[in-house]
């Protein structure tokens, strides 16, 4: 993979988009590498993923305008589908994904961050959907995920105006979960990833599935999804071990595999 690098720290994998000279901008090759990186994750041992960009200026500054400038309608639609396919894969990936936003997260960069479960940013981060200023719409889910995260009115304001916002405003409107000084970002992201990784993996996976599946359903159907996933945790090693240790006041030892047994 020419534009993405990976590093494993215990049960946490760090996936880094590595195109700093272009501010980690997305093009078809970067998207293909990102897809390959997620497909290569060892789901038997990894319990949390951290996604970030190389350098201290940019998470992902957007899609590569140079490569888009000559696209036809058909090519533009195909590029949108490529990005959406990759981002949907990340959004539905069984393992939790934290976006460590270390600078610019504009256009496709903001859309990529929004496809992650949790967004934590540095104090120099900048977010926005500037596409209408370039004569296009957001193409990788920006009009959809932004409204779900910050509400329809705020999403429309940001998209229609092409306004960029700083880290503190992104936190205020609920786009990010936390803001840290640049030098402390990865330390705090990895601390959270470690806390997630220590919990029972089957239960964490089922929680992600329940939230993602249920959010678009009527509450009556959504709780049915939760019921099945709740029931699916029983008779697993983690459930037996966790409850036995709770009752005996011992520290539980969640199993490192994701199979129900």
Where are these regions (language model features)?
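Terminal peptide-recognition signature
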Residues: 15, 19, 33-34, 51, ...
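Hydrophobic alpha-helical membrane-association signature
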Residues: 30-33, 79-82, 112, 185, ...
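Charged catalytic carboxylate motif
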Residues: 29-33, 82, 89, 188, ...
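Glycine- (often His-adjacent) and acidic-residue-rich active-site loop
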Residues: 53-89, 105, 135, 218
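C-terminal alpha-helix plus adjacent terminal tail
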Residues: 1-10, 41-44, 56, 162-168, ...
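Crotonase-fold acyl-CoA enzyme core
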Residues: 89-202, 235-236, 241-244, 260
């Amino acid at each position: 993979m020419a534009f993405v690098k990976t590093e494993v720290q215990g049960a946490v994998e760090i996936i880094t988009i590595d195109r700093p000279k272009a501010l980690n901008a997305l093009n078809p090759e970067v998207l293909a590498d990102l897809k390959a990186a997620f497909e290569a994750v060892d789901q038997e041992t990894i319990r949390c993923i951290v996604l970030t960009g190389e350098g201290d200026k940019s998470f992902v500054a957007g899609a590569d305008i140079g490569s888009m400038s000559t696209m036809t309608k058909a090519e533009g639609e195909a590029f949108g589908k490529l990005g959406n396919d990759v981002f949907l894969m990340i959004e539905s990936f069984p393992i939790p994904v934290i976006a460590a936003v270390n600078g610019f997260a504009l256009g496709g960069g903001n859309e990529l961050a929004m496809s992650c479960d949790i967004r934590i940013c540095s104090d120099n981060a900048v977010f926005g959907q500037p596409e209408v200023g370039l004569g296009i719409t957001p193409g990788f889910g920006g009009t959809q995920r932004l409204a779900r995260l910050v509400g329809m009115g705020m999403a429309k304001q940001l998209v229609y105006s092409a306004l960029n916002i700083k880290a503190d405003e992104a936190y205020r409107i609920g786009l990010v979960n936390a803001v840290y000084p640049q030098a402390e970002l990865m330390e705090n992201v990895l601390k959270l990833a470690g806390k997630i990784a220590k919990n029972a993996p089957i239960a964490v996976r089922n929680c992600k599935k329940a939230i993602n599946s249920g959010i678009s359903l009527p509450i009556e159907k959504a709780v049915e999804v939760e019921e099945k996933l709740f029931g699916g945790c029983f008779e697993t090693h983690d459930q037996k071990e966790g409850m036995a240790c709770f009752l005996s006041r011992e520290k539980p030892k969640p199993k490192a595999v994701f199979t129900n047994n």
